[in-house]
């Protein structure tokens, strides 16, 4: 549109000379041709503009004024006036044409400038439009690529959804078929479950009878366990009493050791003094002491022979005796070093009494273990050796026949432990069987409940459900009772009895081991004592014997309460 406008403006209609003549001719001013031409000049598209029209109007006005002025001045005289007028008219036309040309040139320059400016603006706008067109084309291509990718993705999604739709339709068809088949199977299972309910009621009755029998068995076992607990308490009391005795003996032995140490210190001091006195008085009293020393040597030889016989007798006696004192070898060694042989004999008698008491206690423990084992095995008749209580008060010769055989107490303890473990395993197995039966019945009941939820329940099914709920409640009660029974059985503290018996067995073994140690200590003490007597000089026997006799006498007097404790026990 702008180009067409510029073409029209750049090519304005320019009147030729004829038109200009007709327009500037005053004679033809009022003619219709001139008027049409003037109108064409005024109405022509893209004409001279408002300035040109104003100039034309001014020129025409000036011409009319001159004609009006020249008319009265010069008379009209034929052809001269016409020529003059024509001449003047032509001059005026030339002036007018020059002015019009000048105006047209100026107008043309303005129009060219406007045209150049407009063409420049047009070119700039065309470049911007081309750039925008290129950008829009690039965006269009990118959008077309995006839309093509999106369309491809949507097509793949549509295909995928179509596949899923077909698969879901197939699954729905399969589900419908399975539903119809399950309905038929459930109807058949309903009939079977009704039959199983009747069988479950019979099984429940059998379980109730078994529970009653188990309850009776548990009552019997609880009674026997109470008896075992009382026996355990008695054994624990005996163990506590023995531990107290042991502590008292240890305290007394410590006191005896201290006294023995003090006596040994005094003996050493006396030895040092006697040696000094012997050195000072050796030369002075040598003649007086010789006959006395000979007599003392003879007496010592006789005493030595007697003591040798007594020591041999004591060695044989100690090898036969079974002393079970719980003391360290060092304590006995220190005591035996300062005590006399008579005191040793008295002590052996006390030890024999204590040994007999320990044997009796071990025998009672062995009898109790055997009786418990027989009760656990279900034997109401005990052994003849266990039922005879009169044999406990017989002499030491009959008691020695009743010594517990080696390993029998340990074997009986192992048997007792095995029987208790079997009892617990049996109870656990019964509980496991009952729990399995209860779980199976519970699964059947859950299956029945699911069936009743699927199908419309009738009166028979509702009554069966009520019976099932009652059976579940009863089974839960039975499970609770069985759990309580299991807890009570496990709470029987059989380990305490076994530990007490094992402790007594260990004590007896320690006493037997101590017996051998005591034999060796006594032999060593006697041998050392005799060797010292033979090694000492002859003149020191009398005073040393007198000095040693006094401490031993004091020690024997102080140790009387210690061994009276064994007699009381």
Curated annotation (Swiss-Prot):
One of its GO terms (molecular function) is dynactin binding. Residues 1-36, 385-405, 533-554 are annotated as: Disordered. Residues 102-283, 458-520 form a coiled coil. Highly expressed in developing neural tissues and developing eye. It is found in: Cytoplasm, Cytoskeleton, Microtubule organizing center, Centrosome. It comes from the Eukaryota. GO terms for biological process: brain development; embryonic camera-type eye development; eye development; Golgi to secretory granule transport; negative regulation of neuron projection development; neuron projection development; vesicle transport along microtubule. Acts as an adapter protein linking the dynein motor complex to various cargos and converts dynein from a non-processive to a highly processive motor in the presence of dynactin. Facilitates the interaction between dynein and dynactin and activates dynein processivity (the ability to move along a microtubule for a long distance without falling off the track). Predominantly recruits 2 dyneins, which increases both the force and speed of the microtubule motor. Component of secretory vesicle machinery in developing neurons that acts as a regulator of neurite outgrowth. Part of a tripartite complex with dynein and dynactin, acts an adapter linking the dynein motor complex and dynactin. This is BICD family-like cargo adapter 1.
């Amino acid at each position: 549109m702008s180009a067409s406008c510029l073409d029209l403006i750049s090519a304005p209609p320019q009147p030729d000379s004829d038109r200009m003549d007709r327009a500037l001719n005053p004679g033809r001013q009022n003619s219709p041709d001139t008027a049409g031409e003037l109108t064409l000049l005024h109405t022509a598209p893209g004409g001279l503009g408002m300035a040109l029209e104003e100039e034309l109007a001014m020129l025409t006005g000036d011409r009319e004024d001159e004609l009006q002025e020249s008319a009265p001045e010069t008379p009209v005289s034929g052809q001269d006036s016409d020529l003059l007028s024509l001449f003047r008219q032509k001059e005026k036309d030339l002036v007018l044409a020059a002015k019009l040309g000048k105006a047209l040139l100026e107008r043309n320059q303005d129009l060219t400038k406007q045209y150049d400016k407009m063409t420049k603006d047009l070119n700039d706008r065309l470049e911007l439009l081309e750039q925008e067109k290129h950008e829009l084309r690039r965006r269009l291509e990118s959008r077309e690529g995006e839309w093509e990718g999106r369309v491809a993705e949507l097509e793949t999604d549509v295909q995928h959804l179509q596949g899923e739709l077909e698969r879901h339709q197939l699954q729905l068809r399969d589900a419908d078929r399975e539903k119809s088949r399950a309905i038929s199977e459930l109807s058949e299972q309903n009939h079977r479950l009704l039959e199983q309910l009747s069988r479950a009621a019979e099984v429940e009755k059998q379980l109730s009878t078994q529970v009653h029998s188990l309850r009776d068995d548990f009552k019997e076992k609880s009674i026997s366990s109470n008896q075992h607990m009382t026996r355990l308490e008695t054994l624990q009391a005996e163990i506590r009493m023995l531990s107290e005795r042991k502590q008292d003996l240890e305290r007394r032995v410590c006191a005896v050791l201290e006294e023995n140490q003090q006596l040994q210190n005094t003996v050493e001091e006396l030895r040092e003094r006697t040696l000094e006195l012997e050195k000072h008085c050796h030369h002075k009293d040598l003649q007086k002491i010789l006959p006395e020393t000979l007599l003392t040597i003879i007496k010592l030889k006789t005493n030595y022979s007697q003591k040798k016989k007594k020591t041999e007798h004591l060695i044989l006696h100690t090898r036969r005796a079974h002393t079970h004192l719980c003391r360290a070898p060092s304590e006995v060694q220190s005591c035996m070093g300062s005590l006399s042989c008579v005191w040793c004999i008295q002590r052996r008698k006390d030890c024999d009494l204590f040994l007999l008491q320990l044997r009796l206690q071990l025998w009672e423990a062995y009898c109790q273990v055997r009786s418990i084992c027989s009760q656990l095995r279900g034997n109401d008749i005990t052994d003849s050796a266990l039922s005879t209580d009169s044999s406990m008060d017989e002499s030491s010769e009959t008691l020695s026949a009743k010594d517990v055989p080696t390993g029998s107490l340990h074997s009986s303890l192992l048997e007792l432990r095995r029987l208790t473990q079997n009892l617990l395993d049996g109870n656990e197995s019964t509980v496991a069987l009952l729990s399995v039966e209860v779980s199976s019945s519970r699964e059947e009941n859950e299956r029945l409940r699911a069936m009743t939820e699927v199908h419309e329940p009738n009166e028979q099914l509702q009554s069966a459900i009520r019976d099932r709920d009652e059976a579940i409640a009863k089974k839960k009660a039975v499970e609770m009772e069985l759990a309580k029974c299991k807890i009570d059985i496990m709470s029987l503290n059989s380990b305490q009895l076994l530990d007490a018996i094992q402790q007594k067995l260990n004590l007896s073994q320690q006493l037997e081991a101590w017996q051998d140690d005591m034999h060796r200590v006594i032999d060593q003490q006697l041998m050392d004592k005799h060797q010292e007597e033979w090694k000492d000089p002859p003149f020191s026997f009398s005073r040393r014997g007198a000095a040693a006799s006094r401490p031993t006498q004091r020690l024997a007097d102080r140790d009387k309460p210690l061994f009276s404790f064994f007699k009381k026990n």
